[in-house]
């Protein structure tokens, strides 16, 4: 489901973080901490 987000890299690191993003809290799909603007 978050493939499209990981593909664009919308301010995120990539698909590698997409799966551990929930646990790490560094993913945009869950909690956009590193990107508050979403840019």
Swiss-Prot record:
One of its GO terms (cellular component) is extracellular region. Expressed by the venom gland. Residues 1-8 form a propeptide. Residues 20-39 are annotated as: Disordered. GO terms for molecular function: hormone activity; toxin activity. Its main location: secreted. InterPro entries: Natr_peptide (IPR000663), Natr_peptide_CS (IPR030480), Natriuretic_peptide_brain (IPR002408). Keywords: Disulfide bond, Hypotensive agent, Secreted, Toxin, Vasoactive, Vasodilator. The keyword Magnesium does not apply. One of its GO terms (biological process) is regulation of blood pressure. It is found in: Secreted. Belongs to the natriuretic peptide family. Snake venom natriuretic peptide that targets both NPR1 and NPR2. Exhibits hypotensive and vasodepressor activities. This is Natriuretic peptide CnNP-b. It comes from Cryptophis nigrescens.
């Amino acid at each position: 489901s978050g493939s499209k987000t990981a593909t664009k890299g919308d301010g995120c690191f990539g698909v590698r973080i997409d799966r551990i993003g929930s646990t790490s809290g560094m993913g945009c799909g869950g909690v956009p901490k590193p990107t508050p603007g979403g840019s």
